[in-house]
């Protein structure tokens, strides 16, 4: 009986730690379907949104979600305006110097979208073309690093890049492959206009991003992610939002 009481008290102490007691603010840029976006009623939804809500259940966390602009999202986290980023945030060495990341919850590659039927063999084929992307995402970094002579046009919202592509004001868009496939295959207003012309070979991985030193919170998130991967919940979310668990 004493042992059972001790275990119960330990569990209660864990549940009443500061992380469990307060409501955590989760931020994301809801302009990146199918990962994070808004419904017609302006409700945040998508793969990352479903994922972080399931994490919260498993980790005994109270969360509220805030839609914020991508430009400045890291500054807001550093300033304490929110506690977690759930925004298709690629884990990079540069970002890891300033922030902590969970274990990966999704793997992506960069994709180039062009008018229907067009294909390219490498980023080098974008030489002389105008390529749209969103400010500060890894697609911009990848294209700049490749230095192929493309003109990069950056937008506040990836959707605006696709609108310009549809209107013929640009030649291509580069972004993460789930987003590229969504705009090429699932957006009714762009039906039949685009195709994924190229998939870059280098993989990148998304993690939930936190301020340095949030050790307890990081451990809770990682434990929940690992359990979701082990019991098939992650795969089910991939099928729901991307159509495949691959």
Give the residues covered by each predicted segment.
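Periplasmic-binding protein-like
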Residues: 30, 106-114, 177, 181, ...
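Sec/Tat signal peptide C-region and signal peptidase I cleavage site
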Residues: 17-21
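Short helix-initiation/N-cap motifs at beta->coil->alpha
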Residues: 49, 65-75, 118, 138, ...
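Flexible hinge/capping segments at coil-to-helix
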Residues: 114-131
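Alpha-to-beta junction loops
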Residues: 60-62, 79-87, 129-130, 148, ...
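Extracytoplasmic small-molecule ligand-binding "clamshell" domains
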Residues: 22-88, 97
